[in-house]
UniProtKB/Swiss-Prot annotation:
Record organism: Halorubrum lacusprofundi (strain ATCC 49239 / DSM 5036 / JCM 8891 / ACAM 34)
The family this protein is said to belong to: Belongs to the heat shock protein 70 family.
Claim: Magnesium is one of the keywords in the record: no
NCBIfam families reported in the protein's UniProt record: PRK00290.1, prok_dnaK
The protein's name: Chaperone protein DnaK
Pfam name, any one: HSP70
Record keyword Nucleotide-binding present: yes
Keywords of this entry: ATP-binding, Chaperone, Nucleotide-binding
Alphabetical list of PROSITE patterns matching this protein: HSP70_1, HSP70_2, HSP70_3
Gene this protein is translated from: dnaK
Molecular function GO labels: ATP binding; ATP-dependent protein folding chaperone; unfolded protein binding
InterPro entries, per the entry: ATPase_NBD, Chaperone_DnaK, Heat_shock_70_CS, HSP70_C_sf, HSP70_peptide-bd_sf, Hsp_70_fam
Comp. bias (Gly residues): 588-622
Biased composition range(s): Basic and acidic residues: 492-513
Cited Gene3D superfamilies: 1.20.1270.10, 3.30.420.40, Actin, Chain A, domain 4 (3.90.640.10), Substrate Binding Domain Of DNAk, Chain A, domain 1 (2.60.34.10)
Length: 644
């Protein structure tokens, strides 16, 4: 049965989080590992097993060539793939693997299928990146109800219970992107006034600066470049990230990596102290890159820093003291610290999900498009139809004409950005409008219309008003995924899901079998004197051997393991029956519950695997109850009468 809840997902560069509305409040859902955030990491073991999240991150040092991290930085990037063995994966596919885990873990928590989601993106993501994110969600099996800007979502989490009118600046520095948004909040209306940012700036860059420093120092001291060793580099990356985190609360930390490499003389260790002052000096250029977007957002909103009532920090990287100090210097006030920077975006996404499902009333979200949208006109200029920071959804149109006599077609090239030369902006897509009746230049009337929906997805149409001929385009994602391609990827994703479930079932069966052997051997040892049925004891010992043989057979499937375990369980039940009969008179009322797992859930005294749940008192759900999962037009602008 499908849940009517809409999952809110913060699909992050380094970590992801997900939440759902529970009553009137959004709640973070812990993943299968019990954590409130999930590393955005995917890995492939040598045997083909796919690992996602914490298990993938934990094995990155041993398996760096088959581990994928920070894939969000490549969303919507034309032609980008990651090669693992004989397979190539697009950013959408890798992101879908992360989203699949999120979907599975959420379903486990809710006890129902989860079909719908709100997924957040950096406010400064362009249309390709937004569409790519939506594609990833669909590949993972979600109906993506809405794409929401991360700072906007965070403000919803912050202002859910606050009806006062106020202007809020959201400073969002995540693992791979930086956004700053100015919003007006009041009466349940969340209106984004302006947004700016840098899609190539995030916590990963702080890590990289520290990695460069440590590697340089090590090379100066030992003549070895650790960057040329993938395993050493991964260890260095993990250590740099940990040091960055520690320096948020400490003035100094030590990076200690024994046996980082070796020479003919033996192993070489890395041990180096890093002070916060050194780290901040190494990354001063990075923090400086946040200044202009912040000032530009205030300028675009026509606000001064004194107009800002509250400052909200979003993203784990905002925990760095230098970031908090920079924000305070820019805005003139100390940021709010009552919102968890790692969880605020997911919580806000859940709120938006609640709005869409009808569970949350009286909230209106008015978001904006972060970059201007337009087309290339004569001379390669960029003609804007929709200006940046326009509230969405929106639609704008403009009439153009031909620039040459008897021109019967025009190529419409759609761009997004703020540069005056079209080619210096991001090309989103192109299409051709044909069938224009031959006429002198300047005669045809061609109306170009832009429409942006609530997800920030762009639709463009061009119509020759004389002939009525029209063509349109919906800007596709980074790889231009068709519906058929998405369907195929969904099937592949579903196939992996089934493989993962089958692998998990086999592991659980092995665990149950091993536990049953242990319980049986313990029973025989501890009750040797009371067991006088030699034939039954021999049968149990034979059943134990059968289970051991199946466990030693690497080709044995789940059914074979379960069958052997069941046979052993039946033998144990027989012993339980005999011991029950022998003890009942002495035990008194209720005493017989101690017999060899004969009662529900097995039992804790003597142990056993007979009852529901099995495995000696594991209780309902059995031995696996506490197990971890392993697991591009020449024309003229008629409106302005400029050559175009």
């Amino acid at each position: 049965m499908a849940s009517n809840k809409i999952l809110g997902i913060d699909l992050g560069t380094t970590n992801s989080a997900f939440a759902v509305m529970e009553g009137d409040e959004p709640e973070i859902i812990a993943n299968a590992e019990g954590d409130r955030t999930t590393p955005s990491v995917v890995a492939f073991a040598d045997d083909g097993e796919r690992l996602v999240g914490k298990p993938a991150k934990n094995q990155a040092v041993q398996n760096p060539d088959r581990t994928i991290q920070s894939i969000k930085r490549h969303m919507g990037e034309d032609g980008y793939t990651v090669e693992i063995g004989d397979e190539e994966y697009t950013p959408e596919q890798v992101s879908a693997m992360i989203l699949q885990k999120i979907k599975r873990d959420a379903e486990e928590y809710l006890g129902d299928d989860v079909e719908k989601a709100v997924i957040t993106v950096p406010a400064y993501f362009n249309d390709k990146q937004r569409q790519a994110t939506k594609d990833a969600g669909e590949i993972a099996g979600f109906e993506v109800e809405r794409i929401v800007n991360e700072p906007t979502a965070a403000s919803m989490a912050y202002g859910l219970d606050d009806e006062s009118d106020q202007t809020v600046l959201v400073y969002d520095l995540g693992g791979g992107t930086f956004d700053v948004s100015v919003l007006d909040l009041g009466g349940g209306v969340y209106e984004v006034v302006a947004t700016n940012g840098d899609n190539d700036l995030g916590g990963d860059d702080w890590d990289e600066a520290l990695i460069d420093h440590l590697a340089k120092e090590f090379k100066n001291n030992h003549g070895i470049d650790l960057r040329e060793d993938r395993q050493a580099l991964q260890r260095l990356k993990d250590a740099a990230e940990e040091a960055k985190i520690e320096l948020s609360s400490k003035k100094e930390t030590t990076v200690n990596l024994p046996f980082i490499t070796a020479t003919d003389s033996g192993p070489v260790h890395l041990e180096q102290s890093i002070t916060r002052a050194t780290f901040e000096n190494l990354t001063s250029d990075l923090i400086e890159r946040t200044v202009n977007p912040t000032e530009q957002a205030l300028s675009d909103a026509d606000y001064s820093k004194s107009d800002i009532d509250e400052v909200i920090l979003v993203g784990g990287s905002t925990r760095m003291p230098q970031v908090q100090e920079q924000v305070e210097a820019l805005v003139g006030q100390e940021p709010k610290k009552n919102v968890n920077p790692d969880e605020a975006v997911a919580l806000g996404a859940a709120v938006q999900g609640g709005v869409l499902s009808g569970d949350v009333d009286d909230i209106v979200l008015l978001d904006v498009t972060p970059l201007s949208l337009g087309i290339e006109v004569k001379g390669g200029l960029f003609e804007r139809l929709i200006e940046k920071n326009t509230t969405i959804p929106t639609e704008e149109s403009k009439v153009f004409t031909t620039a040459a006599d008897n021109q019967t077609s025009v190529n419409v090239r759609v761009f997004q950005g703020e540069r005056e030369i079209a080619e210096e902006n991001e090309l989103l897509g192109a299409f051709q409008l044909s069938g224009i009746p031959p006429a002198p230049a300047g005669t045809p009337q061609i109306e170009v219309s832009f429409n942006i929906d609530e997800n920030g997805i762009v639709n463009v149409e061009a119509e020759d008003q004389g002939s009525g001929n029209a063509e349109s385009i919906t800007i596709e994602g980074g790889v231009g995924l068709s519906d058929e391609e998405i369907d195929q990827m969904q099937e592949e994703a579903e196939k992996h899901k089934e493989e993962d479930e089958a692998r998990r079932e086999r592991i659980e069966a092995r665990n149950e079998a091993e536990t049953s052997i242990q319980r049986a051997e313990t029973l025989l040892e501890e009750n040797e004197e009371e067991l006088d049925d030699d034939e039954l004891v021999a049968d149990i010992e034979a059943a134990i051997e059968d289970v051991e043989e199946v466990l030693e057979d690497e080709d044995a499937d789940t059914d074979e393991i379960e069958s052997a375990t069941e046979a052993l369980t039946e033998e144990l039940q027989e012993i339980g029956k005999q011991m029950y009969e022998g003890q009942a008179a002495q035990a008194g009322p209720g005493g017989a519950g101690g017999a060899a797992g004969a009662g529900p859930g097995g039992m804790g005294g003597m142990g056993g695997a007979a009852g529901p749940g099995g495995a000696g008192g594991a209780g309902p759900g059995g031995a696996d109850a506490d197990d971890e999962e392993y697991v591009d037009a020449d024309f003229e602008d008629v409106d302005d009468e400029d050559d175009a």
